[in-house]
A protein has these predicted regions:
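Conserved "HGTGT" condensation-loop signature of ketosynthase/thiolase-family condensing enzymes
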Residues: 1-74, 96-98
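Conserved beta-strand segments that form the floor/walls of ligand-binding pockets within enzyme
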Residues: 5, 77, 108
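Short, acidic Gly/Pro/Ser/Thr-rich loop/turn segments
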Residues: 11-16, 83-85, 144
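Conserved catalytic cysteine-centered active-site region
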Residues: 35-37, 41-53, 81-132
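Short acidic/polar active-site loop segments enriched in Thr and Asp
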Residues: 74, 132-133
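Short glycine-rich or small-residue beta-strand-to-loop segments that form or flank ligand, phosphate
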Residues: 74-81
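Single conserved hydrophobic/aromatic residue that forms the stacking wall/gate
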Residues: 133, 137-144
């Protein structure tokens, strides 16, 4: 990424953890089988949290780390396959929740597991093609 610097990151995970043993009570599998094939021992699952709530929390942490305000954001991209609603987009809900300027271009990018990579490339292209200085990129998935 030419001339682009990642200035802040944030993360937020749901409170509920689902282990492989939890899954083995639902389907015919076990911890050893899942771990051997995926390396995964547990994952997070949303019960009450929404994708937007997770995005807002992570975004606030990233803004704080970067030392910028919502007014500094020129583009908002959310990479997700599990938005709370089809319309408005997760990016538009994030725009409203963070108080981003009304003229901020906001959109979701749906590319499954590669969504973050595609969104990062899109962000780079937008920054290089405009006078915008900062973008907000969220890569979020809500497992219910």
């Amino acid at each position: 990424m030419n001339g682009i610097k990642l200035r802040g990151t944030g993360r937020c995970v749901p409170a509920n953890t689902v282990t492989n043993d939890d899954l083995s009570r639902l389907v015919d599998t076990n911890d050893e089988w899942i771990t051997a094939r995926t390396g995964i021992r547990s994952r997070y699952r949303c019960e009450k949290e929404t994708l937007t709530e997770l995005c807002v929390s992570a975004a606030r942490d990233a803004l704080h780390m970067a030392g910028i305000t919502p007014a500094d954001i020129g583009v908002c991209i959310v990479a997700t396959v599990s938005a709370d609603t089809v319309v408005p987009s997760a990016a538009c809900l994030l725009q409203r929740a963070l108080g981003l300027p009304e003229d901020t271009p906001c959109f979701d990018l749906n590319a499954a597991c590669t969504g973050f990579v595609y969104a990062l490339h899109t962000m780079e292209c937008l920054l290089n093609a405009s006078d915008r200085k900062s973008t907000r990129l969220n890569s979020s998935h809500n497992n219910r």
